[in-house]
Design a protein with these regions (language model features):
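Long, low-complexity segments enriched in small/aliphatic residues
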Residues: 1-75
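Long, contiguous, secondary-structure-rich segments that constitute the structural scaffold
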Residues: 53, 73-89, 93-200
Length: 200
């Protein structure tokens, strides 16, 4: 923006006014209820501020040891797993409330789905928040109605940020966590064994 700042008349920006625009006449003309002509905070459909049932805010970040789902079967990604599951990072206070220890296998669940994960306790996440990286290869079990590898897509909603942007709202997700049932400990994950999958 240096040229624009030094001489805004000669170096107009690529906007309808040639200036920095906080209000968009174009977006205003769409007359959308969920997207105003200027930056505006809308209450998310699901967040800690309106929680009713689930008490933990799930952040599904980009993974450190793979690229989305690529290389999930590679050495570094496998090295980061806990008992072949994607790690779930949880604050010590939340872990203590649920009697969880490092490397415990847990079920992460909400009204949309259920998945397995391995516990990693850390002060790097605040109380009330859990983190599971995206990209674990989808390993569903129909009979048990659970995803065995730690793929957070089974928990997130399929609602766009607005009718204008259509971006995902994957970080607007509430979940809870509990120790795993003995019935699930032997469920295999896709990158280790393909034989269990029931995809038909």
């Amino acid at each position: 923006f240096e040229d624009f700042i030094n001489d805004p008349i000669s170096n107009k920006l690529n906007t309808s006014s040639g200036k920095i625009e906080i209000v968009s006449k174009v977006i205003k003309s769409f007359k959308l209820k969920d997207c105003k002509k200027h930056p505006f905070w809308f209450e998310p459909y699901e967040w800690i501020g309106n929680k009713k049932r689930f008490n933990l805010h799930l952040i599904s970040n980009q993974p450190e040891f793979k690229l989305h789902g690529q290389l999930d079967n590679a050495f570094l990604s496998k090295l980061n797993k806990i008992k072949n599951r994607e790690p779930l990072i949880i604050n010590p206070i939340d872990a203590k409330k649920r009697k969880l220890k490092n490397n415990d296998l847990v079920e992460v669940y909400n009204q949309r789905g259920r998945m397995l994960a391995g516990i990693r306790i850390s002060n790097k996440v605040m109380e009330g928040v859990v983190v599971v990286s995206t990209g674990s290869w989808f390993s569903p079990y129909k009979k048990e109605k659970i995803e065995a590898h730690g793929n957070p897509n089974v928990l997130t909603g399929d609602i766009p940020t607005s009718s204008f942007s259509q971006a995902p709202t994957s970080n607007t997700t509430l979940v809870d966590v509990k120790k795993i049932s003995e019935d699930y400990k032997n469920l295999k994950t896709l990158i280790y064994d393909f034989s269990h999958l029931e995809l038909n």
